[in-house]
């Protein structure tokens, strides 16, 4: 098992998570005793305890006082905060993970975009006005796209959408910077922003879902053209 880590705690965390992912520690199984596991990994027991507590908070493990530590089925117990970890664990499956991420974000964003234009159209107008000074670079488009989603999610009347977006942030930002290296992708997005701006100015929230569906389909087709050339390094949070 080859693990790149910045310190003992990082190494221990990656070792345990990789072992769970590879079914060395399968769901429902009991982790080795603390002393045995610390010797196996090569870290102090104090460091190991801190790592186990962190992994339990993320849903990988179940820790109960006086009982051995049990491995969870992380698909059932973890949240969006492990997306980065899954991307790092399974680089071969990263393109599929991104497909699923983009599909989920498209479906959810249709709800909070509509809500923002319904309840806070002036906020939507203000943030969309930034497109007229938007630099034609991948970095600028990726940053603005996240800003737009974050602002409209917060203005939708349901701030929980912001928490969902926060779970996507690191992974989506890296993918976005790659996606927007395409001038065609930037033009497609700019046209979408302009149409959305017109709806916001007219306080027309009813037509938002149709616009989102169209852009979702078109950007999805664009992504399929780009994803095969995506650098493998995007899967890693450097």
Curated annotation (Swiss-Prot):
Its main location: cytoplasm. Residues 34-53 bind DNA. One of its GO terms (molecular function) is DNA binding. Residues 6-74 form the HTH gntR-type domain. InterPro entries: FA-response_TF_FadR, FadR_C, TF_FadR/GntR_C, Tscrpt_reg_HTH_GntR, WH-like_DNA-bd_sf, WH_DNA-bd_sf. Homodimer. This is Fatty acid metabolism regulator protein. The gene is fadR.
């Amino acid at each position: 098992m080859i693990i790149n880590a910045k310190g003992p705690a990082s190494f221990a965390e990656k070792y345990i998570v990789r072992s769970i992912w590879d079914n060395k520690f399968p769901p429902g199984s009991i982790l080795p005793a603390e002393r045995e596991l610390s010797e196996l990994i090569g870290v102090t027991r104090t460091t190991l305890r801190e790592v186990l507590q962190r992994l339990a908070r993320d849903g990988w493990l179940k820790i109960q006082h006086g009982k051995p530590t049990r491995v969870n089925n992380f698909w059932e117990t973890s949240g969006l905060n492990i997306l980065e970890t899954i991307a790092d664990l399974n680089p071969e499956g990263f393109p599929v993970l991104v497909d699923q991420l983009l599909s989920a974000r498209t479906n959810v964003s249709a709800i909070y975009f509509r809500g923002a234009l319904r309840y806070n159209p002036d906020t939507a107008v203000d943030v969309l006005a930034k497109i007229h000074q938007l630099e034609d670079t991948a970095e600028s488009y990726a940053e603005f796209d996240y800003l737009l989603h974050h602002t409209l999610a917060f203005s939708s009347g349901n701030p929980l959408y912001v928490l969902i977006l926060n779970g996507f942030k690191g992974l989506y930002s890296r993918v976005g910077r790659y996606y927007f290296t395409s001038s065609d992708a930037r033009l497609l997005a700019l046209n979408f922003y302009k149409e959305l701006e017109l709806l916001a100015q007219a306080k027309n929230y009813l037509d938002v879902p149709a616009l989102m569906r169209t852009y979702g389909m078109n950007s999805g087709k664009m992504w399929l053209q780009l994803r095969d050339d995506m650098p493998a390094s995007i899967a890693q949070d450097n």
